[in-house]
A protein has these predicted regions:
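Flexible, glycine/small-residue-enriched loop-and-beta-strand segment within the central core
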Residues: 2-143, 169-170, 177-178
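Leucine-rich solenoid repeat scaffolds
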Residues: 155-157, 164
Length: 187
């Protein structure tokens, strides 16, 4: 397997009697305090910071970096070449494409009416080559289109079209400036 786990990690936390296996690809690095539940699969090159939680039924592609104190709360699909910075929260039923950057303390949500109604939980969909700035919030069910850029502190309440800049609270859409146009360079 050619992987490295620090002391104080839990790989294969059994959340119930039906819990399956964990599958980590080559060259995984799981740092101390991190918990990876059963029924998680990751491609090659997964690297975590300290105190990361990756819950059950999560699938991660190749070369995913998960920053310290990040929670991936289960039933999440993450593509390849993704950089998730410190303190990010990713709720169940979220889909993240390839070559995506999530800035520090970004928060994704999946419940449009917390404890008020019993609506189905719908996490955001983040398409390929998207960058999400620090402290941005994405509300339940929104889609951020490919090659878009969400500014720091933005609150995204509605879908962001491809190649669009979303800034402010609530986020307004602007044409993507030329210097932000193109693919993310995450390898």
């Amino acid at each position: 397997m050619n992987s490295e786990t620090d002391l104080g990690t839990t790989i294969g936390y059994e959340y119930g009697p039906e819990a399956g296996e964990v599958s980590l690809g080559e060259q995984a690095v799981i740092r101390s305090g991190s918990v990876v539940y059963c029924d998680v699969s990751a491609g090659d090159g997964l690297v975590t910071g300290h105190n990361v939680v990756i819950r059950e039924d999560t699938k991660l592609g190749d070369d995913v970096v998960v920053g310290t104190n990040t929670v991936i709360d289960g039933s999440v699909t993450i593509g390849s070449h993704v950089s998730i910075q410190t303190g990010v929260y990713i709720p169940p039923n979220t889909t993240i494409g390839d070559h995506v950057f999530l800035g520090p303390r970004a928060v994704l949500t999946n419940d449009p009416y917390p404890i008020r109604r019993e609506d189905p939980l719908r996490g955001p969909t983040i398409e390929d080559h998207v960058s999400i700035g620090a402290n941005a919030t994405l509300l339940s069910g929104v889609t951020v289109g490919e090659q878009s850029f969400v500014g720091a502190g933005a609150v995204v309440t509605r879908d962001v079209p491809p190649r669009t800049l979303a800034v402010g609270s609530p986020a307004e859409h602007e044409p993507l400036p030329e210097h932000l146009d193109g693919n993310n360079l995450i390898k």
